[in-house]
């Protein structure tokens, strides 16, 4: 299992880490490297962005005038989701200089993140997970193509997979020439969300939706928050095209820098769907799952595509139970199947994977479907629709139809994704 790194420990100098885009000067960093998530000497800097003020400056100009001669390495420049840069500094003196710089609005540690995935388990089919949320009934809306764009910010997507409509690709991982998936995780998410309805393979929740392969994780499934923000910066550059973004990744940590980038993406009109995490803990300690503006998704085990708990049991719990690994808590908005999910994989293949990573693209596909039918819907409209149309605790199973799941670990009882035709319309 690929897990998040380390135990969260941070010394904040302000209380609110869910920062707004109009932020006062904030310093959220710990220069003492006893947190495994923190990347030593690596920081995310946001600059003042009021063009009418004298303390506004271009990020590259700022680096050249303030940092280049100090031996600081420039990693990324951000222009769209925020104005800022990611840097690697030679020593603590540079950090102290930045704290007193009038151009600087925010300083935060860069951190390691990872894909929320478990170990793989091995004519076209409708996966049981799609059946469980009644996704197969939606094929009559548009059997060949869903008019929406889904960005997968992950390990990339198999660019040549015959079952996927990869519309655009971009990699932010050094040493790669494109966003072709060298791990498999991102391709799996893409198939769950949007595999084509054709004569082979599988069918996704939003068949044939345009996929944006945004590679922000390495072949190991690991990455850095600064790289993820660069991916968010890129989709914000294309905010008039991208409808939904999937972030099935994170760490057990806080990141004000990532919160700001996500909140600005949502304000730009992009619905952000994230995985709750795979540690069996309260998701409130995980980033980006704990951001109140995103749609956070937990995972259930479902083995027969039906309610009632009559399917075979799994290593992660009985059929129709909250998966044993799934994070939970009041930050979770909705649940979806996430155990032994059969989907597309790298090298034009298919496999089963397990994790809240697999649950999130079910919800992202549903969000894309809703946007295709309601183009003017805001991210908040989409989130509200998915939550209010979901299956609730009071929806009992009749033995074969759709009903709630069991084994919720808290008293919040997030709804189970449901997207039957009568709901989506």
Give short role names for the model-derived ranges.
Residues 22-34, 64-126:
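Autoinhibitory propeptides
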Residues 76, 203-209, 213, 232-234, ...:
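C-terminal subdomain of the subtilisin-like protease fold in secreted/lumenal serine endopeptidases
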Residues 43-45, 84-86, 106-108, 149-153, ...:
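Structural recognition of the beta-strand scaffold that forms the well-ordered cores
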Residues 138-169, 177-227, 240-243, 254, ...:
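Subtilisin-like serine protease catalytic core
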Residues 176-190, 281, 351-363:
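Gly/Ser-rich catalytic serine loop of serine hydrolases
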Residues 23-40, 89-96, 118-152, 170-182, ...:
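N-terminal domain-start motif of subtilase-like serine proteases
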Residues 154, 164, 270, 286-372, ...:
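Extracellular S/T/G-rich loop segment that most often corresponds to the catalytic His/Ser-adjacent loop
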Residues 9-23:
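Sec-dependent signal peptide cleavage junction
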């Amino acid at each position: 299992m690929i897990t998040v790194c380390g135990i969260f420990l941070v010394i904040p100098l302000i209380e609110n880490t869910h920062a707004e885009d109009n932020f006062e000067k904030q310093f959220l960093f710990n220069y003492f490297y006893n947190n495994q998530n923190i990347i030593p000497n690596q920081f995310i800097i946001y600059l003042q962005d009021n063009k009418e003020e004298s303390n506004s400056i271009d990020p590259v100009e700022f680096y050249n005038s303030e940092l280049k001669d100090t031996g600081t390495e420039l990693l990324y420049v951000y222009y769209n989701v925020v104005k800022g840069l990611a840097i690697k500094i030679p020593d603590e003196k540079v950090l102290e200089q930045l704290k007193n710089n009038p151009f600087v609005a925010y300083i935060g540690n860069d951190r390691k993140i990872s894909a929320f995935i478990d170990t793989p388990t091995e004519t076209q089919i409708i996966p049981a997970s799609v059946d469980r949320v009644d996704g197969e009934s939606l094929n009559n809306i548009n059997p060949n193509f869903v008019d929406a764009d889904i960005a997968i910010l992950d390990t990339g997507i198999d660019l040549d997979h015959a079952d996927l409509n990869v519309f655009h690709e971009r990699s932010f991982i050094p040493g790669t020439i494109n966003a072709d998936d060298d791990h498999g995780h991102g391709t799996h998410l893409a198939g769950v969300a949007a595999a084509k309805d054709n004569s082979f393979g599988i069918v996704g929740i939003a068949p044939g939706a345009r996929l944006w392969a945004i590679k922000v994780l390495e072949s190991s499934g690991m990455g850095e928050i600064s790289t993820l923000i660069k991916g968010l910066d890129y989709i914000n550059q294309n905010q008039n095209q991208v409808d939904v973004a999937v972030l099935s990744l994170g760490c057990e940590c806080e990141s004000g820098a990532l919160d700001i980038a996500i909140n600005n993406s949502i304000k730009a009109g992009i619905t952000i769907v994230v995985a709750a995490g795979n540690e069996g803990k309260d998701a409130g300690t995980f980033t980006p799952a704990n951001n109140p503006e995103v749609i956070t998704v937990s995972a259930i085990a479902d083995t027969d595509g039906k309610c009632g708990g009559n399917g075979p049991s799994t290593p992660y719990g009985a059929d129709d139970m909250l998966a044993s690994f799934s994070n939970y808590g009041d930050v979770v908005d909705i649940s979806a199947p996430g155990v032994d999910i059969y989907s597309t994989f790298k090298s034009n293949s298919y496999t089963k994977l397990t994790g809240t990573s697999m649950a999130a693209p079910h919800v992202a596909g549903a969000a894309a479907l809703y946007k295709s039918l309601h183009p003017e819907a805001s991210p908040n409209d989409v989130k509200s629709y998915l939550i209010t149309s979901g299956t609730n605790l009071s929806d009992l199973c009749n033995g074969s139809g759709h009903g709630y799941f069991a084994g919720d670990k808290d008293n919040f009882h997030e709804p189970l994704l449901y997207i039957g035709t009568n709901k989506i319309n």
